[in-house]
Amino acid sequence: MNPKIEKLFRSPYSVPNGLQVTDEGVWIADQITDRVALVELTESSDYGVTKLIRDVPTESSNTSGLAYGDDALWLAANGSGSMWRQVRHTDANEGEILKVDPQTGQTLQRHKIPDGGGTHGLEYDHYENGYIWVETLKDKVLHKVRISDWSVQHTIPLPYERAHGVVRFEDGIWVVHTSDRLIIKLEIEDGSKLDEIHVSNEYPEPHGLSLSGDDLLYCDATSGWVVKITF
């Protein structure tokens, strides 16, 4: 697949490592401060940014993924924030998923990554309510988790290392593999490859991923850009 790829605007944060489009705009998570910002999804200004609607602090740490569902934000805390800032008592020791109030940043739920270790990506399943997809990096797998009892219902293998952003489609699930600059569409049942997008070196590196209408958006934690992929 060879879609159109274009830079849209720069994040309000220097290290955006997760994003999620909602009806209000696009949420962006900062890996350093673990704040989340809601910004307008519009043409960028002369300064290369869009208008900030609000931003809120969270109890996440080393945030490496963002999703939205059940009227809440879901943040992937990839261990403590010691690489970026002073450690807080709320930091995760290893990977955790936090359900967060989008108005206040209050933690509503907190769950361990299935089988432990770190994580870079998650996706609230809008085709099957009550489920969320969560990566377990050390095992190179993606789990479908039932939220009510935090139990793994299904697992598919991931084809490459350093998996990142995740987007569920009706007929598959897209997963970013940052180091390989690939966004792979996987079959839901067995994880077989259905399609792929190669992001060449002329474009920012893909990290977080979100659906945006019929298109995809991704953010680059190294350059701060938000990028659009048009099919």
Language model feature labels by segment:
Residues 4-10, 47-56, 106-112, 151-157, ...:
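A short beta-strand motif characteristic of beta-propeller blades
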Residues 10-23, 58-71, 77-80, 113-128, ...:
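Beta-rich, blade/repeat-based domains predominating
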Residues 25-28, 73-75, 131-134, 173-175, ...:
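Conserved beta-propeller blade signature
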Residues 32, 79-80, 138, 179, ...:
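Residue-level signature of beta-propeller blades and closely related beta-rich strand-turn architectures
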Residues 35-37, 86, 95-98, 141-143, ...:
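A short loop-to-beta-strand structural motif that recurs across blades of beta-propeller domains
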Residues 40-45, 101-105, 146-150, 187-191, ...:
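Short loop/turn segments that connect beta-strands within beta-propeller blades
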Residues 76-93:
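Short, conserved, GDST-rich strand-edge loop motifs in beta-rich repeat architectures
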Residues 205-231:
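Blade-level signature of beta-propeller repeat domains, shared across WD40, Kelch, NHL, RCC1
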